Regions:
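Extracytoplasmic/periplasmic substrate-recognition and gating elements
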Residues: 4-7, 27-32, 36, 56-57, ...
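Extracytoplasmic/periplasmic substrate-binding proteins
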Residues: 11, 18, 24-25, 71-74, ...
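Extracytoplasmic "Venus flytrap"/periplasmic binding protein-like
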Residues: 28-105, 136-147, 241, 248-249, ...
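Conserved C-terminal helix/tail region of periplasmic/extracytoplasmic solute-binding proteins
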Residues: 36-37, 139, 349-403
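Hinge/lid segment of periplasmic solute-binding proteins
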Residues: 71-129, 153, 179-181, 270
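Extracytoplasmic/periplasmic solute-binding protein
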Residues: 110-124, 129, 153-202, 218, ...
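Glycine-centered hinge/linker elements that transmit conformational signals in sensory
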Residues: 156-158, 198-230
Length: 403
């Protein structure tokens, strides 16, 4: 391998916020070090399916983007395929920028479970799930943008009274499971989250948080806040339903933000984190990892550090991304500045509550099928929770992650 080059892989689009920011980071790296970057863009699926083989071979890159979480980065770390980054974290003070719940997805124990143990990955952006509001539709019916949970339910009721289904939902993929998890988080404490996500103890599936969330979804369906017909709706179609003005509200991720900015130019829309909750759905973005086989670990670490620099972080913010260390005053677009300020507030409160499907590799689909039964009324609250519990327990046992 040529000492004058470093091999970097990621799977972001060139015109997206991460793609633009990281291209800038590569340019700065080359200027600073005199080392040439050999960049290869891979597809997410290419890396997901072949990571272990690639990292075991001479073809491995020196630094690459990899998916956060137990079944992905955690698994590779536990197999000895990723470099332990503890010394670099100390050297560059990365834990000052990547801290609290953001750091959870960069640290893995010897079983590959996130949240404790050694550093194997470093993120430089984040994501959370927010409630998007079409202000034109709120104004049309004289409804205020909700500030509290009670306001939220009152607003949805007013839309229903006017013949409008308020929430754009879908249970074929993710939007509804994120809403369900947000309702869980609004009643959950840190211990519950640790038990659920990091297998620290048993999850009380018939307890207050999960029962409340599941009952609330059922209740909202019966009141017409969520359509019974959304069980087969995919995420893209739920997003389109908000973009084209069919539905006034959409609870989904900040990854839609850039699209709403470009595709809803004629609509007046706004957003906020979910009301009356200490925890929100969200996490760090994906992580930079350094393969154990890399011969250029010091250079790889230097590149990672550049992606956390002010210049790269501010560019990411100005490109519509969600950097973890940007200065809101350097962000020119007002709406993006609002987004970054909101996310910085979430980080300050250490409020990221992760995602509901993370604990097992099959739980995403299993949660959806349980929630489909809840929405179309074929199963009641207790049965749905028992089904979730069985699937969760099976998946956790199969993964062998619980001590």
């Amino acid at each position: 391998s040529n000492p004058k080059t470093i091999k970097i892989w990621h799977y972001e689009e060139d015109n997206g916020a991460q793609g633009k920011a990281w291209a800038k980071a590569m340019e700065i790296f080359e200027k600073k070090t005199g080392v040439k970057v050999e960049f290869e863009k891979k597809s997410f699926e290419q890396i997901r399916q072949n990571a272990a083989q690639i990292l075991n071979s001479d073809e491995a890159p020196d630094v690459m983007e990899y998916n956060k979480g137990n079944a992905t980065a955690g698994l590779l770390a536990s197999q000895g395929l990723l470099s332990n980054l503890n010394d670099y974290v100390k050297k560059y003070n990365w834990d000052k920028k990547v801290s609290g719940s953001l750091a959870a997805t960069g640290k893995y124990n010897d079983k590959g479970v996130m949240g404790s143990g050694d550093w194997y990955g470093i993120t430089n952006y984040g994501e959370d799930v927010v409630m998007y509001y079409n202000k034109d539709m709120f104004d049309k019916y004289g409804i205020e943008i909700p500030k509290t949970f009670d306001d939220l339910e009152a607003a949805m009721q007013k839309f229903v009274d006017n013949g409008v289904t308020p929430l754009s939902e879908g249970v074929a993929e993710y939007p509804l499971q994120h809403l369900w998890w947000q309702l869980v988080l609004s009643k959950a404490n840190d211990k519950f989250i640790k038990n659920y996500e990091m297998y620290d103890g048993d999850v009380d599936w018939q307890g207050e948080a999960t029962t409340y969330a599941t009952k609330t979804i059922k209740d909202w369906v019966s009141k017409g806040y969520i359509s019974k017909d959304c069980t087969g709706t995919k995420a893209e179609d739920a997003g389109q339903g908000f973009m084209n003005g069919t539905y006034p509200m959409f609870f989904s991720g900040t990854w839609w933000f850039g699209r709403f900015q470009s595709d809803m130019k004629n609509a007046n829309w706004t957003f906020s984190t979910f009301p009356d909750t200490d925890k929100v759905v969200g996490s760090s973005g994906n992580i930079w990892v350094i393969p154990e086989n890399s011969k250029k670990k010091d250079l790889a670490a230097q590149f990672i550090d550049i992606t956390l620099s002010d210049e790269v972080q501010d560019l990411m913010g100005n490109s519509g991304g969600l950097p973890i260390a940007a200065d809101p005053d350097k962000i020119t677009d007002e709406k993006t500045k609002e987004l970054i300020t909101s996310f910085n507030g979430v980080l300050e409160k250490n409020a990221l509550g992760f995602y509901p499907d993370w604990p097992t590799s099959t739980f995403y689909d299993e949660l959806n099928s349980s929630l489909q039964e809840l929405v179309n009324g074929t199963s009641g609250v207790k049965d749905v929770l028992n089904q979730m519990k069985d699937n969760y327990d099976k998946g956790v046992e199969a993964a062998g992650v619980k001590s």
